[in-house]
Amino acid sequence: MKLLSGLLLCSLVLGVSGQGWFSFIGEAVRGAGDMWRAYSDMREANYINADKYFHARGNYDAAQRGPGGVWAAKVISDVREDLQRLMGHGAEDSMADQAANEWGRSGKDPNHFRPKGLPDKY
């Protein structure tokens, strides 16, 4: 636990890089909200083959907030995938999820992963 806390703190300090703390933290909080909204939409949609789209969309929306949002999206995505691996989900699917996460975080259009027929609401 101490190691994880230390890594998160160091990651946060390095992520700020001269930018104001309050701005960075605000971006991170709003970015985490974007990630939660994408996750909630994914659960609500319950649409086959849509998970990569929601991964990319959550990361994209969070990254649009700024460096704090990028940081939050990366931390949340990495922790989620690590937990999935620990619970026995396939490494291949995890790698595909991480590719979608990075796609969105880098500012690329998440609709690249949007499956045909997914309701316009999402």
Swiss-Prot record:
Modified residues (Pyrrolidone carboxylic acid): 19
Region of interest called Disordered, as start-end residue ranges on this chain: 90-122
InterPro entries linked to this entry: Serum_amyloid_A, Synovial_Prolif_Regulator
A Pfam family that the UniProt record links to this protein: SAA
Gene3D superfamilies for this protein: Serum amyloid A protein (1.10.132.110)
Signal sequence segment: 1-18
Protein localization: Secreted
GO cellular component: high-density lipoprotein particle
Comp. bias regions, Basic and acidic residues: 105-122
Domain of life: Eukaryota
GO biological process entries: acute-phase response
Tissue: Expressed by the liver; secreted in plasma.
Cystine bridges: none
Entry-linked PROSITE patterns: SAA
Keywords on record: Acute phase, Amyloid, HDL, Pyrrolidone carboxylic acid, Secreted, Signal
Biological function: Major acute phase reactant.
Family (UniProt): Belongs to the SAA family.
Subunit structure: Apolipoprotein of the HDL complex.
Name of the protein in its database record: Serum amyloid A-2 protein
Organism the protein comes from: Oryctolagus cuniculus (Rabbit)
Gene it is expressed from: SAA2
